[in-house]
Each structure stands twice: as C-alpha cells, then as structure tokens.
C-alpha cells in the first residue's frame, strides 16, 4: 500500500513539474533570431519612449512595449560589463527580470545602456532596428516617491489617496485614503527636506472638518487648522504654510477648460514646540497674495511667491482681472536662533519675465532654484503655458529647461543629491497628469525625462487617474495608515489661534475647487 502511495505521489510530483515547466515556457518564449537579421535604419517605436534618456542606477526595470507589427519580438539589453539580458515576447511587451536588471545597471553606472530590438514579420523574417541608447547616471535617485492619486477633478471627486512607491521596484503602498475619514479630501503632503520622519497632510471632511496631521518623531498629532502649501525649516523647529481661498471655475472652450483663482492668501508660521502660529507682517500683506513657500537649505531665507490683489470683491468667481494677475518670486531672511524676520525682497519680478512665477523649490545643495512660469495666475497644473525654469542662485540667471512640452509642467521636487527632479506633466495628451523623472547635471542642464516606470508597460494606456504632487524622499513613510486615519477621526486636536482669518470651510465631494489636482 505504501509503495502504491509513493508511486502516486511521484507521478503527481512529475506531472506537476511538467506543468510548471510548460507554464514557464509559455510565459517566457524563446526565439532564435538568426545570424543576419534585416537591418531597419530607424529606432523601433516603443511605449513608453525610453530612448535617449538618462536613468538612475537604482531605478526599477523600465519595461516597454514594442509598437511594431510582428509575430514575435525580442529585446537584448546590455552594457559594457556583465551579461546581457534577453527577453522574448509574443505580444511585444518586454518585461525585464528585476534581479538581472539591477545587476546590470548597478555594475555600469556612468556608462551607456543599449537596447537592441528584433521583430519577426509575417514572412518569418527577422528585422533588427537601430539600437536604442540610454545612459546610466553615476548618481542614484531617492528611493521613495510620495504622490496623490485620484481622478481629474471637475465638479466632484469620489476617491483620492496619498501613496508611496519604491522606485527601485514596483512596490506601492497606501499612506492614507479619503475613505478612512468620511470621504474626505487630503492633499498638500510635505516633508522636512527629503526625510520621511516629519510629514504633514492637509485634511478636509464634511464630517470631521478641516485640520492637519503632523507626523513627527514617531507620533501623529492633529492640528486644528488646515495647512496649505507647506515648507519646513531645515532645523525642524518651525513650518511656514499658506492659507488660501482657492476657487475653481470653467472656460467655455480651450485645451484646458478648468481654471483656478486664489481670491485671498497669506503665509503663517507654526512653531512646533510652542504649538503656536504667528503671522509675520511681511508674509501677510493685506494688499497682496502670498503663497508657495520654500526654504533655502541653510535655513537663512524663505522664498515665496507674491502677487497684487487686483480685485475689490474677494468672493466673486472669477474676479475682475483674474487673467492679469502675475506673481513675483520673493524671499525674506530669517534667524532661527532669535526668531527674527528681515525685510521681503524681490528675486525675480513678473514685470521682468512677463509671466507668473510659481512653485519655487531649491536644490538641496543650494545651487539651483526650480520654478514654473505661466501666462497668469497661481495654478500651473491648469495652465498649458506652464513650463519649468531653472535659476542659478549664484548668479541670478535663469533659463527655460529643454525638457518642457507643449502641455503643462507643474508640481516638482528634488532628490536629496540635487541630481534628479520629479515633476508633473500632461505631455501624454494634455489631460492627465503623470510623474516624470529627469537628470540635472552640475551645470544645470536637464536631460530628456522619462515617465515613472510600471510593471505593466501598457499601464498608462487606459489609466484615467492622475499622479500629482510628486515628493522624493530618501526613506519611506513609516507611520501606518490606520494611525493616520484614527488621528484624523479623533476629536482631540492641538488648538491653535490663527492670527488672521482663513478661508477653508468644511468640504464634501461637491466642492473639489477648494483643492489642487
């Protein structure tokens, strides 16, 4: 009896092994290209367009699909050292094994990465396309990208969340979802530099009201006021944030029919240990709109955007002259030891540029200031004219980056080593925001960007959600989503006295115009 059972077990094991081998064989086809394929004098059409780009040596596999008619497909990925990676496909989808990819790109930092593409046509002939050449940078990118993921906002939202993605692979985890606190809205996530230990998230809920979650030193507290765009002082002692009266409206026609106006705004300063909010006079001028704060890495200057209020009625939407409003780039000195502010000064004026200056962010080495400029207003993601510019802070000279498209480029952040930027772009058709990564060298030259790699190379083809506000951080968000949600629902909060009146009412799904996409 035992012998019979052993024989049956052996047969089952053998059959199981055969099934597994067949499955692997079917999933990973192998084709013999032949010694002399016909040469095609152009690069293959692939999606995403991972060609002529500079990539980090720690990025996830850059899977792609070959958009050429054929019966079979092969890709050979190789560099100066190490074994080549060969991937065969019946569909044109090239999914690169993670371990082999890591070994290849980490071994060849600073060198070229070659991709040879072969396609077998209906006549059973193999075609070889012109080689794709990319470059592996010597510098890695911060490991984690934190972003907001949601459908485009018109008149309502259903669901939104903040997620974090490990850029070295395809792992994605939820930081917090609006469903966890009464279908609320969450945005304006920010960090102290590229570290994940200090994080804030702005919340609005029809049930729980408006507040801000502050995660710091392993604890999470709820502050009884909603922060807008936030900038942490490098010391971690204080944060400057905006309060904004943002409203959305619509145009009858255009490449982008949505528009946003900030009817009133100011900058406030929150002192962490004292749990106190102050309003420096230079940052809350009643005749101007202050927004988008960012600190210099040494903490000596706060940079921000400031524009004149061109309307008397601060409730009408859209207000008079909304399309004539242009913001200047300003800065103000600060002494953290004495808590003393200097006088605000203009770094770059809208009169000089002819455009509205938005979203300043300084590289961690203090050398460059990355910012957006658009025709008017404060919301570049809704402005097709919005482009990225880079200022050399040593000289004050700035230039338009070559990586711009005909569509909107907007939210952006720096990697901790000042060599990489993540930014939002609508270049895939003008409607949906995607995250792109680009290398910036020591002279300020930016190289051709590439869209955030996905495990499925066709991922973006049918995706209707947007990736927004990409923040690069070195580590990862450790605080759990359950702790964040529980704190958001809690009645306990840190009470703060706001020295000036804000404009952030409770909001439900019918009021998306109070937020940013």
Predicted regions: what is each one?
Residues 2-15:
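N-terminal Sec-pathway targeting helices
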Residues 26-517:
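Sequence signature of WD/YWTD-type beta-propeller architectures
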């Amino acid at each position: 009896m035992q012998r019979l059972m052993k024989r049956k077990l052996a047969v089952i094991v053998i059959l199981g092994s055969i099934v597994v081998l067949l499955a692997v064989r079917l999933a990973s086809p192998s084709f013999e290209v032949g010694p002399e394929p016909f040469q095609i004098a152009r690069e293959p059409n692939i999606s995403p367009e991972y060609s002529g780009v500079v990539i980090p040596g720690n990025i996830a596999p850059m899977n792609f699909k070959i958009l050429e008619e054929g019966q079979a497909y092969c890709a050979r990925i190789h560099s100066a050292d190490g074994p080549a990676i060969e991937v065969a496909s019946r569909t044109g989808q090239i999914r690169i094994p993670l371990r082999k990819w890591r070994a290849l790109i980490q071994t060849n930092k600073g060198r070229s990465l070659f991709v040879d593409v072969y396609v077998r046509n209906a006549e059973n002939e193999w075609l070889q396309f012109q080689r794709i050449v990319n470059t592996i940078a010597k510098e890695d990118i911060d490991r984690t990208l934190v972003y907001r993921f949601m459908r485009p906002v018109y008149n309502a939202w259903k669901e939104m969340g903040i997620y974090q993605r490990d850029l070295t692979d395809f792992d994605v985890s939820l930081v917090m979802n609006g469903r966890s606190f009464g279908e609320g809205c969450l945005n304006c996530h920010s960090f102290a530099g590229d570290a994940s230990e200090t994080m804030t998230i702005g919340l609005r809920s029809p049930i729980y009201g408006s507040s801000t979650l502050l995660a710091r030193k392993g604890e999470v507290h709820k502050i009884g006021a909603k922060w807008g765009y936030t900038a942490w002082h490098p010391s971690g002692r204080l944060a400057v944030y905006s309060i904004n009266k943002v409203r959305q409206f619509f145009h009858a026609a255009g490449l982008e029919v949505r528009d946003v106006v900030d009817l009133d705004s100011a900058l406030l300063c929150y002192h962490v240990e004292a749990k106190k909010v102050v309003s420096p006079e230079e940052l809350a001028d009643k005749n101007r709109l202050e927004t988008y704060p960012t600190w210099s890495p040494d903490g000596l200057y706060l940079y921000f955007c400031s524009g004149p209020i061109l309307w008397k009625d601060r409730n009408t939407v859209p207000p008079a002259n909304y399309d004539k409003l242009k913001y200047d780039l300003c800065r103000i000195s600060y002494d953290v030891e004495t808590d003393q502010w200097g006088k605000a000064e203009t770094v770059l004026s809208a009169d000089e540029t002819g455009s509205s200056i938005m979203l300043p962010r300084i590289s961690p080495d203090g050398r460059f200031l990355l910012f957006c400029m658009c025709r008017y207003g404060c919301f570049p993601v809704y402005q097709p004219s919005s482009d990225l510019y880079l200022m050399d802070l040593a000289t004050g000279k700035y230039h338009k980056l070559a990586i711009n498209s005909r569509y909107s480029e907007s939210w952006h952040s720096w990697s901790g080593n000042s060599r990489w930027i993540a930014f939002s772009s609508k270049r895939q058709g003008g409607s949906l925001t995607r995250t792109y990564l680009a290398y910036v060298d020591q002279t300020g030259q930016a190289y051709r960007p590439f869209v955030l790699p996905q495990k499925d190379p066709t991922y973006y083809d049918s995706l209707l959600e947007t990736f927004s506000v990409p923040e690069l951080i070195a580590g990862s968000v450790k605080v759990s989503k359950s702790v964040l949600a529980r704190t958001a629902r809690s009645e306990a909060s840190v009470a703060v006295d706001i020295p000036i009146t804000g404009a952030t009412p409770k909001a439900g799904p019918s009021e998306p115009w109070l937020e940013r996409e």
